[in-house]
Amino acid sequence: MKRQAWYLFLSVSLVILIVCGLSYWAFCQAMRAETNVRYSGMQSVISLQLGKTISGMEMSATNVFNEVEKHLDSPEAVIHALESESNLNPDVRGYFAAFEPNYFKEKGTWFEPYVHHTDSSKFEMTQVGSARHDYTKSPWYVRAKNIKMAFWSDPYYYYDGTNISGHYSTFVKPVFDANNNLACVCGADITFEWLGSELERINNGCRNSQQVNKYRLMRALDFYSMVLHKDGTCLIHPEDKNLPITDNKMLADLDQHNTGFVEMDVAGVPSMVFYGPIDGIDWAVAVVTPLSDLQKPFTYMAIALALLALISMIVTFVICRRI
């Protein structure tokens, strides 16, 4: 092949490589934007739906607490109010009313009736207040007494050797009598097992959504979700997928209820974590997806453009030889 043909071949090949390189760069920019929008949007939807579930729990619990407030004339009336309203939301593990010391003199210092599930359909009432369980010193009781408004307690593990032992979070609300004095602190317990099943139900809804699955772009959409406390503690996660938060920016974002994403190893798998707060509670939802799944479109497009460049250069070489 003559020198002029080589010059032509090399010039055209250079143009082909530049065009393919720019095409891949543009594709990468678009795919990164699409990935962030897709998974940030998915995280936002999961947070919103889980937040609605928690808000529904709050409304149901508030109805129970309002009934307690209407029946502060006797301890029997309080117990009846708890028992009569407990079936409104079977997902609540139990309702309690922890009264101020000697509010009912016949009940003494500690009176805390607790109406709770014994199985999937039955409730029973237990008096749990005692010198051994001095609820008046519990953080949730002290906080409710001080701030005089409803809130969610920090997650905790309760153990008493019975079937109600487990990981809990409690929606707490102070209840006042007709003279605006604190009568008791009411609470509704939810278990992390129940919340985990709700999170998985929401995840499955997202996985099977037609809108999510319409443009997979060669990805398996292999994601899962976690619930994080604002201090970085992983509250709910799939088995063997615990996420220890060590990234300072992520910890700051969780504490300040900001959204974001970060690349980190989860259970030994390089992953991308998209996180954001749940409204009304100091928790956040994190959507985790393996980097290997996110990289599939980039890998396939790089191979396709490389093959296209190679074929184009071969065709150019053949044409240049015949000139």
How would you describe each model-predicted region?
Residues 1-33, 37-38, 305-317:
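Extreme N-terminal signal-anchor transmembrane helix of membrane signaling/transducer proteins, especially
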Residues 164-205, 272-274, 282-293, 297:
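Conserved beta-strands of PAS-like sensory domains
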Residues 65-69, 82-90, 145, 203-220:
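Short regulatory alpha-helical segment in sensory/regulatory domains of signaling proteins that mediates
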Residues 139, 297, 301, 319-323:
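Juxtamembrane alpha-helical signal-transduction segment immediately C-terminal to a transmembrane helix
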Residues 106, 136, 194-285:
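Intrinsic low-complexity, intrinsically disordered coil/linker regions enriched in small/polar
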Residues 24-40, 46-61, 67-76, 88:
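Membrane-proximal amphipathic alpha-helices
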Residues 87-166, 231-249:
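Extracellular/periplasmic ligand-sensing ectodomains of membrane signal-transduction proteins
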